[in-house]
Regions:
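Bacterial N-terminal signal peptides that target proteins for export
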Residues: 1-11
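Low-complexity, acidic/polar, glycine-enriched regions of mature
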Residues: 21-206
Length: 206
C-alpha cells in the first residue's frame, strides 16, 4: 500500500500517484510553479483570468484504496489578483466574493474516484459566500519525474471544474460576464528527500 498525507501552503487540491520505488515521507509544494486561478468570459470576446495568491490545503491519498483518499483546501478571498487593482477591489465586495463577511473559499472532498490511467475525479463541496454546493474536479497527474536541478522526485498535477457563479449569489452583470466560471489548479510538488539521480544534472535552474 502507498499512502501519504500533506499539510501545505500553498495548496494541493488533487491526488498524485506514488513515484515507483521511492519513499514519500515528506513532500513540499514548489510555490513558483503552483497556481490556483479562474477564467470567465467577458462579452464573449475574451476570457479574463485571475489567480489567488494565498491558500492552504491538506491531502490524504491511498493508491491501493482510493476510497480512503481526501482533499481539503482553503483560499484567502482577499488574495485575488486579476492584474487590475480596481477590479480586484470590486470582486472582494458584496456583489461578488463578499470577502468581509466570508473571507475564505473552501473545498472539502467527499470522494476521490479513479477515471482511468493518470486521471481522477474529485467530488466535494465548494463553499463560497457562505454557501456550499457540490462540485467535481477533473484531475490529471501530468508527470512524475526526477527533478534535474534539485535531485529529488517531483510530480505535476492539474485540475479543473466549472461552476455557475449565480448559484452562489453572484448575479451581477449576467450576460456581459459569463455565468460559467472555470476554476483551475496547476501544481508542482517535490520530495523533501534528496537522492542521486541517474540522469545528468543541468547547469542551473530556470
Amino acid at each position: 500500500m502507498s499512502r501519504f498525507s500533506f499539510l501545505s501552503v500553498p495548496m494541493l487540491v488533487v491526488a498524485a500517484a506514488v513515484l515507483p520505488g521511492i519513499s514519500i515521507a515528506g513532500w513540499e509544494v514548489d510555490p513558483t510553479h503552483t497556481h490556483i486561478g479562474f477564467q470567465v468570459s467577458h462579452l464573449k470576446l475574451t476570457k479574463t483570468p485571475g489567480i489567488f495568491k494565498r491558500f492552504e490545503s491538506t491531502l490524504v491519498f491511498d493508491e491501493q484504496a482510493i476510497e480512503k483518499s481526501s482533499v481539503k483546501f482553503v483560499i484567502d478571498a482577499t488574495s485575488i489578483d486579476t492584474a487590475h487593482e480596481g477590479r480586484d477591489k470590486d470582486l472582494q465586495g458584496p456583489d461578488w466574493f463578499s470577502a468581509a463577511a466570508h473571507p475564505t473559499i473552501t473545498f472539502a472532498s467527499s470522494k476521490v474516484r479513479p477515471a482511468g490511467g493518470n486521471k481522477y475525479w474529485i467530488d466535494g463541496d465548494l463553499t463560497l459566500r457562505g454557501k456550499a454546493i457540490p462540485v467535481t474536479f477533473s484531475a490529471v497527474l501530468t508527470n512524475r519525474t526526477d527533478h534535474p536541478w534539485h535531485k529529488i522526485p517531483a510530480v505535476g498535477i492539474a485540475a479543473t471544474t466549472t461552476i455557475k457563479r449565480s448559484a452562489f449569489g453572484m448575479t451581477q452583470h449576467l450576460g456581459a460576464i459569463s455565468d460559467d466560471v472555470t476554476l483551475s489548479v496547476a501544481l508542482e510538488r517535490r520530495s523533501l528527500e534528496a537522492r542521486v539521480l541517474a540522469t545528468p544534472v543541468l547547469p542551473s535552474p530556470p
